[in-house]
Amino acid sequence: MEKLYINLDENSYWIYIGKGLLPTLGKHVAGADKILLITDENVEKYYGDQITQIVEGRILEKVILRPGEPTKNLGNVGHLLEIMLEKGLTRSSKVIALGGGVIGDIAGFTASIYMRGIDFIQVPTTLLAQVDSSVGGKTGVNLEQGKNMVGSFYQPKVVVIDIDLLKTLPHRELISGLGEIIKYGIIYDGEFFDYINENLWNLLALEETVVTKIIKRCCEIKAAIVSQDEQEMGVRKILNFGHTIGHGIEALTHYEKYTHGEAVILGMYYEAQIAKNRGYIDESYFRDIEMIIRKTGLDLNISQFILTDLLDAMTKDKKNKGGKISFILPRGKGNVQEVLLTPEELATFLYTYLYV
């Protein structure tokens, strides 16, 4: 088992990474008067009974939500809050978020506002959640106008990453996780980028040593960034590489056509093109990025989107400043910076490279 400490003063916590860690959950809910398990239909059928056995003897309530990004909405937050009140959860209760990024986001946000905050535990079941969304304390839900428009920074009490849970994932969800994994190599660690490229097939085959090393390194990178900037006022912004175009694509497709990781892969590809177009990276490094992205097998053609619609979606991004659209763009291996583009500059790029 590997473990990492996220140092955030009074909000600090441990991340545990390894095989067969789900049964250890019992010790992390010790002292809770009641436990609320929030999960989705797909995860519950594999692990719901196991969780019940693990917390045997304690009062356990379950809420099973539909899988998928549309579940992240204020209506479901209200539903969860009503259940928490109805079941008598107190400030001594604990919430377990068992699922992917969607479950972690909505469970964490609901825990953060119930009675001004009760403890929650992240048990990520997807590769994307294990390498990214379960760490760092970003929680939230979507509005029609955009992704994660309502949310909070609220840290879990512990993150339990059991790599055995990846065995029940469909291949598409492993590809989705690659989006965030590749991102970490590009934004922070050139050597890690090379390691991912060399071991991508072993990762997709769930080779234990490779999976553990990659998950741990992603968590280390995110921990280093979040420890410096918990609430995204500075360096944490680099985690948004691929997410400006990615979020725009998700919004245009109503969060149904692409997984979050797939949208990030598309976003990284086109944002790397912007970086090359502006002279921030050379052709050779762009080809390295393109090669690893193409290994995911994702169709990179997004010319089906109407230019004005894609622009409109990106202008609503909460990261924007002063009427300009915020991008995190590569400047070299393991190095990125924030660049603000006017809608006109972005329209010129998109028209030139996507629509002719």
Swiss-Prot record:
Pathway: Metabolic intermediate biosynthesis; chorismate biosynthesis; chorismate from D-erythrose 4-phosphate and phosphoenolpyruvate: step 2/7. This is 3-dehydroquinate synthase. Its cofactor is Co(2+); Zn(2+); NAD(+). Belongs to the sugar phosphate cyclases superfamily. Dehydroquinate synthase family. Binds 1 divalent metal cation per subunit. Can use either Co(2+) or Zn(2+). Zn(2+) binds at residues 180, 243, 260. It catalyses: 7-phospho-2-dehydro-3-deoxy-D-arabino-heptonate = 3-dehydroquinate + phosphate. Its main location: cytoplasm. Signal peptide: none annotated. Catalyzes the conversion of 3-deoxy-D-arabino-heptulosonate 7-phosphate (DAHP) to dehydroquinate (DHQ).
